[in-house]
């Protein structure tokens, strides 16, 4: 399924049905009086977060969503039928923005969370409502209230426990493929990953979700490369995993490039808990490993771990370090498979 994390949508709630002008007409009843019914309410437009979706691709093929209008009232005091609501089903983690793309109208972060986007119009009163002591036969009724037209933006920010960061070709997708059932595209050229990938990782009977976003380059926050538009997907992460390519010519510069982009992007990304890892150590000897780790620790001011996604050396230790930094309430117990009773 193709990935889409931003969509423009046009919505309209239903108009209310018109009230009815009608009079009771029966045999032997000369002055029956008014009996016009009210119009039905127009349908409303809602957005609801549902499970099982991680893209807004459906909104590329349908951008217009119009709720039903209410049915006009009828004689014999019959009210019109209400218009049916329409529900936009979106992935968990979807932000709903106003037309200016800045004002946040709602943030759907839980399954089943629902928000009203456009309320349907009220139905008009029939002429029965206007009967009074001085006006026994009113010939007026109210029109239904008009529906609401508006344009909104849907912006998806994936909800994951860990966000994978690094320059292009730092080995992020290789790490995700080695630790989960996710199968991102892996190749020996920059920007192999063109959209975020999610993988469920298990360690010590606990599972958590890792998001792999396209690699960042210097100036990404100004629109260079493709990574800056995906940084929003790691805003919700509890911890960031920063992979530094051990085969790079200047890994300290690589480290500062990513940190600089986090600071320039804002949103407190640079202040999130972070695990820094020297990757691709399968290509380094012991002396090179020690030298590069010391360089990175000096640059980062904190501990640096080592691993190789290709050979899986050090991967388990990195996963345990991530688990220790994720809030306990965000971790899920790994389901234990029930053993089947032996049968001959």
Swiss-Prot record:
GO terms for cellular component: cytoplasm. CDD domains: Obg. Its EC number is 3.6.5.-. GTP binds at residues 166-173, 191-195, 212-215, 279-282, 308-310. It is found in: Cytoplasm. Residues 160-327 form the OBG-type G domain. Its cofactor is Mg(2+). GO terms for biological process: ribosome biogenesis. The keyword Lipid metabolism does not apply. Mg(2+) binds at residues 173, 193. GO terms for molecular function: GTP binding; GTPase activity; magnesium ion binding. Residues 1-159 form the Obg domain. Keywords: Cytoplasm, GTP-binding, Hydrolase, Magnesium, Metal-binding, Nucleotide-binding. The keyword Aminoacyl-tRNA synthetase does not apply. Pfam families: GTP1_OBG (PF01018), MMR_HSR1 (PF01926). An essential GTPase which binds GTP, GDP and possibly (p)ppGpp with moderate affinity, with high nucleotide exchange rates and a fairly low GTP hydrolysis rate. Plays a role in control of the cell cycle, stress response, ribosome biogenesis and in those bacteria that undergo differentiation, in morphogenesis control. HAMAP family: GTPase_Obg (MF_01454). Monomer. Belongs to the TRAFAC class OBG-HflX-like GTPase superfamily. OBG GTPase family. This is GTPase Obg. It comes from Ruegeria pomeroyi (strain ATCC 700808 / DSM 15171 / DSS-3) (Silicibacter pomeroyi). The lineage of its organism: Bacteria, Pseudomonadati, Pseudomonadota, Alphaproteobacteria, Rhodobacterales. The gene is obg.
